[in-house]
């Protein structure tokens, strides 16, 4: 494809996507007019003091599914500390589905499962907090959660929010299964208001799967919003989710982030290079970096990927701008996004079957044409000796990437 054809094609695609979803957004606005919109809007950006940068931590679902208990959660908290991951910013320990009994108690409260959480969630929260970490919990904007093994919070939003606050919960992943048929744009703000009244700042993660494009309405409602369906530990799943999430790049900002789902790094379904691509794209996309492997038993290879301080720094950059695709030529892609300090994050991605060279042009990544640029390779941990003018070209292996920070020096 010629560069002109490519440049024209991308805006047209964005226009088509935008026009497709605008009717849905207007509908959601009209639905919400019956609520106190000013109360919801107070949550916009930083009003709960959370999500200034994308959250980092761990979630139980990808590796353990429903096979969780308080011993494993405590051991995971221990591992975050002993591995040094907590010092890098991985501070959330998030319990996913299946933690509660199927029935509420006589007061209408959720009951931690006696067989797996005999000490209760508050005791687990106290332990996690004693390690300098934060505890996350899971619920659902329906009558039951997705596993159907425990109740959802539909109709109990205020009661459950107060319970979570009393337990010391710091993060709520709020799923979208088994509802009453009403739209997420109706059900999710109810929990938002309940959390605001709970007396405790709780990060609100909207797990709506992207069905009604929550990137377009999520910022007054939550601190992050899923833009896609669930990830699987395969190259095809990961890369297709990255594509879908990128469409909504302009909606990410401090206080509210696009969420392409938890990380699969370390679960064994991809190669090392593919996991590096996975972690790199999530980092430049300002996605939540929630580990989904068993961090108690991480390999050295996995640790080297998820503990890359330079890549994490891109994700946590205070500028808070999600990177976008700026050039696509067949299986070759150039992603770029601005960073603080007049720097640029640059990803060269080879989705194809063979090793090849990829070129990034300054005009595509909004660097002045005659600028002399220094390039830092974040996976090789070295600043390239060569200075670059006008473009940068690198040879990239199949299903692999190069990740740089570019800094104009003249």
Swiss-Prot record:
Give the intrachain disulfide bonds: 66-98, 146-177
**Which residues bind substrate per the record?**
96-97, 173, 208-212, 226, 230
Q: Which residues form a coiled coil?
A: none
> Would you list which residues are glycosylated?
297, 391
Q: What is its EC number?
A: 3.2.1.22
Question: Which N-terminal stretch is annotated as signal sequence?
Answer: 1-27
Q: Name one GO cellular component term.
A: secretory vesicle
Q: Name one GO molecular function term.
A: alpha-galactosidase activity
Q: Which UniProt keywords apply?
A: Apoplast, Cell wall, Cell wall biogenesis/degradation, Disulfide bond, Glycoprotein, Glycosidase, Hydrolase, Secreted, Signal
Q: Which residues form the active site?
A: 175 (nucleophile), 230 (proton donor)
Question: Which example biological process does GO assign this protein?
Answer: carbohydrate metabolic process
The places in or outside the cell where this protein is found are: Secreted, Cell wall; Secreted, Extracellular space, Apoplast
Keyword Cytoplasm assigned to the entry: answer is no
Pfam families the record matches: Melibiase_2, Melibiase_C
Q: Which family does it belong to?
A: Belongs to the glycosyl hydrolase 27 family.
Q: How does it assemble?
A: Homodimer.
Name the record gives this protein: Alpha-galactosidase 1
* Organism of derivation: Arabidopsis thaliana (Mouse-ear cress)
Corresponding gene? AGAL1
